[in-house]
From Swiss-Prot, chain A:
Molecular function terms from GO: DNA binding
Any one Gene Ontology BP term: leaf morphogenesis
Protein name: LOB domain-containing protein 12
One Pfam family in the UniProt entry: LOB
Tissue specificity of this protein: Expressed predominantly in roots, and at low levels in shoots, floral stems and open flowers.
InterPro entries, A to Z: LOB
Transmembrane segments: none
Further facts: Gain-of-function mutant pck1-D (T-DNA tagging) shows highly epinastic leaves, reduced apical dominance and sterility.
Span of domain LOB: 7-108
Family label: Belongs to the LOB domain-containing protein family.
From Swiss-Prot, chain B:
Annotated tissue distribution: Expressed in a band of cells at the adaxial base of all lateral organs formed from the shoot apical meristem and at the base of lateral roots.
Gene Ontology biological process: organ boundary specification between lateral organs and the meristem
Function: Not known; ectopic expression of LOB leads to alterations in the size and shape of leaves and floral organs and causes male and female sterility.
Stated induction or repression of this protein's expression: Positively regulated within the shoot apex by both ASYMMETRIC LEAVES 1 (AS1) and ASYMMETRIC LEAVES 2 (AS2/LBD6) and by KNAT1.
GO MF term list: transcription cis-regulatory region binding
Protein name as annotated: Protein LATERAL ORGAN BOUNDARIES
Domain LOB intervals: 10-111
Species, as recorded: Arabidopsis thaliana (Mouse-ear cress)
Family classification: Belongs to the LOB domain-containing protein family.
Alphabetized UniProt keyword annotations: Developmental protein
Pfam families in UniProt: LOB
Record InterPro entries: LOB
Amino acid sequence: MGGPGSSPCASCKLLRRRCAKDCIFAPYFPPDDPHKFAIVHKVFGASNVSKMLQELPVHQRADAVNSLVFEANARVRDPVYGCVGAISYLQNQVSQLQMQLAVAQAEILCIQMQNEPTLQSHHQVLELDQDHKALLLNNNNINNCNTNNNNNNFGYAMSSGQFNSNFASPSSIMQMQMQMQMQDPLKQESLWT
Amino acid sequence: MASSSNSYNSPCAACKFLRRKCMPGCIFAPYFPPEEPHKFANVHKIFGASNVTKLLNELLPHQREDAVNSLAYEAEARVRDPVYGCVGAISYLQRQVHRLQKELDAANADLAHYGLSTSAAGAPGNVVDLVFQPQPLPSQQLPPLNPVYRLSGASPVMNQMPRGTGGSYGTFLPWNNGHDQQGGNM
């Protein structure tokens, strides 16, 4: 760049001045892209851009120029809001997405909590099964006792009249014990209802 | 009051900074009060007083306050981050939008797996990409818009959305008035 035979950079061409070898614009505003410098010059001014670039290390100037070009384009497209319009729009998007995400996560949590009470219901069914089994065991005991005893009162063992009149007899005592054992599971079952 | 130049009123921050007389009708006076000298100093450093004068003269009076506030915001961002300026904030917000969109898509997929569909699950993706390569995260992150710079009146999106013409939503940028200007190579 610079010297006879080469084109001046886009900035020196626009400003109608000689492009020196150490021109600060030349590396970033090639002559084949005149619009790039024109828009930066319009929004920021050549002297301001020159000062900004001089204050930066050389390896950061390309990024600085690109961001200045972007901001200049935004300002020309929207003279009122410039880049702030884009920032405001993106901030709105972030807020909306955060709200939608919170709603979706809350629904997932509700579904997971709905699955947990179902397990408790299943547990309750198991408890009922145990009660039922206990009742069956007691019935088996009743049958065994009656069969072993060959008691003539088999058909009337549960009669309260029979129970009262035979209070002192050994078979009456056994019948009373069976009744007490049978009542326990019934009480236990009623607790679950 | 804003444009008075009698001895009872101070010159505006702009005329004080530029060491000139604050005339009646000074275009800066309504927006750069003398108690906010830093605001004009930033705008002058980044944009230049003559450029701002030209820009404001091209706007309608009721648009100038928003324009000055957005210029002040951008100037402050540029002073804080001389390399990336507002583009650093835009890149950061873009990454936030992408990350949140992915999380939302994953959550909606979970909901679909449970066999439930919600209004949010059917919502189409709403991400608009700027024509700019994401930059590294700036070392000094810009805070969200603070009350001083918050834009008054309707939001830019609401102002500009009805004026969009033609093209699908993906090609319409709500903050560029729907115009399809060709920008620089970015």
